[in-house]
Design a protein with these regions (language model features):
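ABC transporter nucleotide-binding domains
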Residues: 1-242, 325-327
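Short catalytic/signature loops enriched in Gly
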Residues: 5-7, 26, 234-327
Length: 327
């Protein structure tokens, strides 16, 4: 039996809460998450807007300190001193969804990619490093792009410049927040193929944050589905997306164009992280509970009153659902 590799980056019972205004309850944006990412692995973190996935990504990057739990990178707890974070962010780089907002319109492509090298005091050949990063990102010949400005590039080319700016520091892990959301459909596949190629060529790890389960299917080794601050289902992407067990995952999948049957329309109010309900946090919107299936399975009371608990961060198929566990 092949031993399981330890996680390169892991969240251990991470909580992130923001103070409420005018005496309101704290907003529990991340409410207890275990999640591991191994070397050379792409993990998709999926959920609708407001579920806490971007806040979790920011906590993993050290941009926001957890209010509970912690982050471990390469076997060591993440420290929040300036020097430690600077060293950490050389090894873990962020790729944002909007390349137009990420790139300074006054800077050339060369300066945009070289910025990280200058921040981290790179001592080698800067021009060679920039050229190699642009080439790896698919902008060839790289010298042709050195003096261009963002407005002279297509959306896909701008996103490749952003990726080159991350690659130039030779990171071990990328955190990509909706990396193709702002791109045309014709370009999305090219950027996803680029991320897969970088994983294969450089043994890069990646956390891809997205609301799109179709994107997760095309790029990820493993998927983690997030709802109201918690991971509610996780496992290898093929197993989770071909046989989803959590009603929320089923609802997300049902709206994909190729999904069989009618889309599942979730009732009730969108999740509010300052008012996490008792029991299963999805129960107020759960079609299984509303349709009587949970009652017939004998778990309706548990759905309303008993927290299913925090899933572990390993690669096994797991679900935080009383009804799924009873089947």
């Amino acid at each position: 039996m092949t031993p399981v590799k330890p996680a390169l980056l892991s969240a251990n019972r991470v909580h992130v809460a923001f103070p409420g205004l005018h005496g309101a309850p704290d907003a529990r944006a991340v409410d207890g998450v275990d999640l591991g990412i191994r070397r050379g692995e792409i993990v998709a973190l999926v959920g609708e807007s407001g579920c806490g996935k971007t806040t979790l990504a920011r906590a993993l990057l050290g941009l926001v300190a957890p209010t509970g739990g912690g982050v471990v990178f390469d076997g060591r707890p993440l420290e929040y001193s300036g020097r430690s974070l600077k060293a950490y962010r050389k090894r873990v780089q962020l790729v944002l969804q909007d390349p137009s907002g990420s790139l300074n319109p006054r800077h050339t492509v060369y300066d945009a990619v070289a910025e990280g090298l200058r921040i981290h005091g790179h001592r080698g050949d800067e021009q060679a490093a920039v050229a190699e990063a642009l080439s790896r990102a698919g902008l060839r010949p790289p010298e042709r792009f050195f003096l261009r400005h963002p407005h002279e590039l297509s959306g896909g080319q701008r996103q490749r410049v952003v990726i080159a700016g991350a690659l130039v520091l030779e990171p071990e892990l990328l955190v990509a927040d909706e990396p193709v959301a702002s791109l045309d459909a014709s370009v999305r596949g090219e950027i996803l193929a680029l991320l897969l190629r970088l994983r294969d060529e450089l043994a890069l790890s990646a956390l891809v944050v997205t609301h799109d389960l179709g994107l997760a299917w095309n790029i990820a080794d493993r998927v983690a589905v997030m709802y109201l601050g918690r991971i509610v289902e996780t496992g290898p992407v093929e197993q989770v997306l071909t046989a989803p067990r959590h009603p929320y995952t089923r609802a997300l999948l049902s709206v994909l164009p190729e999904a069989p049957g009618d889309p599942v329309v979730l009732t009730g109010e969108p999740p509010d992280p300052s008012r996490v309900p008792p029991g299963c946090r999805f129960h107020a919107r759960c079609p299984i509970l509303a349709g009587g299936e949970a009652e017939r399975a004998g778990v309706a009371e548990a759905c309303r009153t008993r927290d299913p608990g925090i899933l572990t961060g390993d690669d096994t198929v797991q679900v935080a659902c009383h009804w799924a566990a009873a089947r």
